[in-house]
Each structure stands twice: as structure tokens, then as C-alpha cells.
Amino acid sequence: MTPYYEDSAVQIYHGDCREILPTIHADRMITDPVWPNADPRLAGSSDPAGLLRSALSVANCKTVVLQLGRCSDPRILAAVPDKWPFLCVSWLRYAVPSYRGRVLNDADVAYAFGDAVASAAGRRVVPGTCMSTRGEFLRGHGRNRTSQQFQETQDAMPHPAPRHLKHVRWLVQWFSDEGETVVDPFCGTGTTVLAAKGANRKAVGIEIEERYCELAARRLAQGVMF
């Protein structure tokens, strides 16, 4: 299959990850999957657990890291097969939080399954917290007082679920080793592959929506963070 975008470190494929994953090699998976109460604009939002279960059933990697928002329904984690035992949970905090109704949206959460990275000086134990001071896609105002205000700013974003590059860089650093290949089967606008490339990893991104493939390719080609 011909990549939608390719450079010396990254390949992006436009298509269904369930069809593409069996054809590629990757050491670690770091992704932000479609979750049960996801924005309906996201492909796969009608059956997120089924989508994740199907994708993981054809994946062959040592580690799976799933990043979820604080308001994302975590029951999707039941879709992770037993062949990847639970490893740890990490908190990806925001220095400037927002509000979603009654909930203070001050962190994402990452769940890791499978093998830890190789033990080395400075990497004997895996920490559990990362702090990010800003996002790469600016929302216009950081403190959304109501669910309606939150949704209005989300609707104006290039992607319904952007993640902070610093958070994903941290996940790449602590859940993969230099020189390995990281795959993101729900690539979106390419934050994971951008983070992996910057950390001397190879990366493969898979995205079913061509408009997001285009944005990811543009970010990589221009070397931009937004």
C-alpha cells in the first residue's frame, strides 16, 4: 500500500487501521482511540469498543498506550486483549485547565499495557506525571464555564480531539526506546508521529479521514507544532 505521506522517519496511511495494521511492523503503539462518549464527528464513534477491539486483534507490538481525556468513558479499556497485561497509568496534566460543565478538565490519562522500556541510566523507573503549559491548537479561551461553551470551542478546532504535543512526547519518551517504530492507528492530525520523529523514533500513522491525513502531512512537511 502506498503511503499518503512519507519521509525518512514517518509514514502516514489513509485507510482503515484494521486493514493496514497487519501489513506493518511496529514495536509500540501510542494512540488516542475513539472513546465511548466521543464527538459524533469522529469515524467509529458508533462502536468505539468494537473498533478498538478489532484494531488490537490484528496489532503485533510490545506495548499499547491509550490516551484518554478526563471526561472520556474508560470502560473502553475492556477491549484491550489479555496478551498485553496492565503496566501502569499516567497523568498528563494541564497547567491551564478548562471547564466542562461541573468538571474541571485539568488532565488527560494514559493507560499502558504490555512491556516496559529497557532499563537504562535515567530510565530505571517510569514516572507517572507530565505537565503541559499549552496546547498546539489554540481554543480562543481557556476556561470554558459550560458544556455548551466547551462544545462551541471544540467545534471550531481543526480536529475534535487535539492532544498536547508535550504530553505525547513524554509518552513516546517513556513507553518506547530510541530507534524503535511507534504506530498510531488513530493518527488524527499527526501529533504522535510528530512526537516520535522528534525523539529519534520511526513512526507509522493510520487515519481514515483524508482531511486529517492532509493536515498531518502538512505539519510534518513544514516541521510545525500546530
What are these regions (language model features)?
Residues V34, L68-C71, F186:
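Short strand-turn motif at the edge of the Rossmann-like AdoMet-binding core
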Residues S45-V96:
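Conserved Class I SAM-dependent methyltransferase catalytic core
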Residues H14-E19:
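Conserved SAM/SAH-binding loop
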Residues M1-P3, D32:
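Short, charged N-terminal beta->alpha structural module
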Residues I24-I30, P40, V80-F226:
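Class I S-adenosyl-L-methionine
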Residues N37-G44:
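Conserved ATPase-coupling elements of RecA-like P-loop NTPase cores
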Residues P3-I12:
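Beta-strand-turn-beta hairpins that frame and shape the catalytic cleft
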